[in-house]
């Protein structure tokens, strides 16, 4: 008997998560330098100075365990978003929170609903806990909420919605989400994943935290990896009613967020200038991508995130490989069932120009 046969049956069915290729790996493989990475939707402006100072002040305390409750950071989040600290759960990135939600509310035989082309961690965690995935066919690359409602049955425990969606960038309005939540049975938990919400225009942004007052079955997760620039520290938070947050505290690891992440997150949380700089660059440069695609006849999915997904109308793997040889890393998404597409993170203007120039060369665009 092999160890695979000994493993949890859900784990037996899994394939490892494929992250964006690291710059160092490409340097080793091809021996090239001056590489740009437009693969993982990271903040192109680097690590915020406010977070650097906070980390420096924590270095002498690293022999001590972090505050398991994250009291100070929770207080800062509560103040910024007009919440109660008891509503907040901290996570080692929002991925940690997605897993925490699934482990808390679903088990073998239960059903979890999510969309086709949604964040790949949803099906991964569903398999890992031996739950049944109800993957709803996408509508115009996004969530078909009416089909979600039709799929609900007595076994449904959890619904995942990403807004904006990754990797397609589709966006649901507040009215659409409100109407949907009003029709979901109140015992079914709805997890609204808002990792990219800071990149949507302020006038379009969903006031999801206000919806918590109407829908006690709603859990909203946020990431500090994207607009806030803390991807390497792994920090995110979820907001829910206090009863649900209390359940999360029964399941989460006792020290799931490290001291440096706690300090950096608290510092950058109110660094509005840094976040707005990233959002403004994204708005401007995303428009350049759209104009580039329109000029050269490339099809793309309109995006509200800090990325754009381009349809090359043929298998995209050769384009991806050719871009690597040009020193440009983007994200293949065949694992999402989109083999003809590449997802490209919005970078700095000069990085985006390198990507444009590389595509013109590779595709012989005229």
UniProtKB/Swiss-Prot annotation:
Record carries keyword Amino-acid biosynthesis: yes
Record's catalysed reaction(s): L-histidinol phosphate + 2-oxoglutarate = 3-(imidazol-4-yl)-2-oxopropyl phosphate + L-glutamate
Keyword Amino-acid biosynthesis tagged: yes
Sample GO molecular function, one term: pyridoxal phosphate binding
BP terms from Gene Ontology: L-histidine biosynthetic process
Record keywords: Amino-acid biosynthesis, Aminotransferase, Histidine biosynthesis, Pyridoxal phosphate, Transferase
Cofactor: pyridoxal 5'-phosphate
Entry's EC annotation: 2.6.1.9
InterPro entries with a match to the protein in the record: Aminotransferase_I/II_large (IPR004839), HisP_aminotrans (IPR005861), HistidinolP_aminotransfase (IPR050106), NHTrfase_class1_PyrdxlP-BS (IPR004838), PyrdxlP-dep_Trfase (IPR015424), PyrdxlP-dep_Trfase_major (IPR015421), PyrdxlP-dep_Trfase_small (IPR015422)
CDD domains (UniProt xref): AAT_like (cd00609)
Pathway per the UniProt entry: Amino-acid biosynthesis; L-histidine biosynthesis; L-histidine from 5-phospho-alpha-D-ribose 1-diphosphate: step 7/9
Modified residues (N6-(pyridoxal phosphate)lysine): 226
Oligomeric and partner information: Homodimer.
UniProt similarity note: Belongs to the class-II pyridoxal-phosphate-dependent aminotransferase family. Histidinol-phosphate aminotransferase subfamily.
HAMAP family (UniProt xref): HisC_aminotrans_2
Protein name in the entry: Histidinol-phosphate aminotransferase 1
Organism field: Mannheimia succiniciproducens (strain KCTC 0769BP / MBEL55E)
């Amino acid at each position: 008997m092999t160890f695979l046969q000994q493993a949890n049956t859900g784990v037996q069915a899994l394939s490892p998560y494929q992250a964006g290729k690291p710059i160092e790996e490409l340097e080793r493989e091809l021996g090239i330098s001056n590489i740009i990475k437009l693969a993982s939707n990271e903040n192109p402006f680097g690590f915020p100075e406010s977070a650097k100072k906070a980390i420096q002040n924590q270095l002498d305390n690293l022999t001590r365990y972090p505050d398991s409750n994250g009291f100070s950071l929770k207080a800062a989040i509560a103040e910024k978003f007009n919440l109660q600290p008891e509503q907040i759960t901290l996570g080692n990135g929002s991925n940690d929170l997605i897993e925490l939600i699934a482990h808390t509310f679903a088990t073998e035989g239960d059903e979890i609903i999510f969309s086709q082309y949604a964040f790949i961690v949803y099906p991964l965690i569903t398999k890992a806990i031996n739950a049944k995935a109800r993957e709803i066919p996408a509508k115009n690359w996004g969530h078909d909420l009416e089909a979600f409602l039709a799929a609900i049955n007595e076994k449904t425990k959890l619904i995942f919605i990403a807004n904006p969606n990754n990797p397609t960038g589709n966006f649901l309005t507040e009215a659409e989400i409100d109407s949907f939540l009003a029709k979901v049975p109140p015992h079914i938990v709805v997890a609204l994943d808002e990792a990219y919400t800071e990149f949507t225009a302020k006038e379009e942004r969903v006031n999801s935290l206000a919806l918590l007052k109407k829908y006690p079955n709603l859990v909203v997760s946020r990431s500090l990896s994207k607009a806030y620039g803390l991807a390497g520290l792994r920090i995110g938070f979820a907001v829910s009613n206090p009863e649900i947050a209390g359940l999360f505290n029964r399941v989460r690891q006792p020290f799931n967020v490290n001291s440096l992440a706690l300090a950096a997150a608290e510092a950058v949380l109110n660094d509005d200038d840094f976040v707005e700089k990233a959002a403004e660059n994204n708005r401007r440069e995303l428009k350049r991508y759209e104009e580039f695609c329109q000029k050269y006849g490339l099809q793309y999915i309109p995006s509200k995130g800090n990325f754009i997904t381009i349809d090359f109308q043929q298998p995209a793997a050769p384009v991806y490989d050719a871009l690597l040889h040009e020193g440009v890393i983007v994200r293949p998404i065949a694992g999402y069932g989109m083999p003809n597409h590449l997802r490209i993170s919005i970078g700095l203007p000069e990085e985006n120009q390198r990507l444009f120039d590389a595509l013109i060369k590779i595709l012989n665009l005229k």
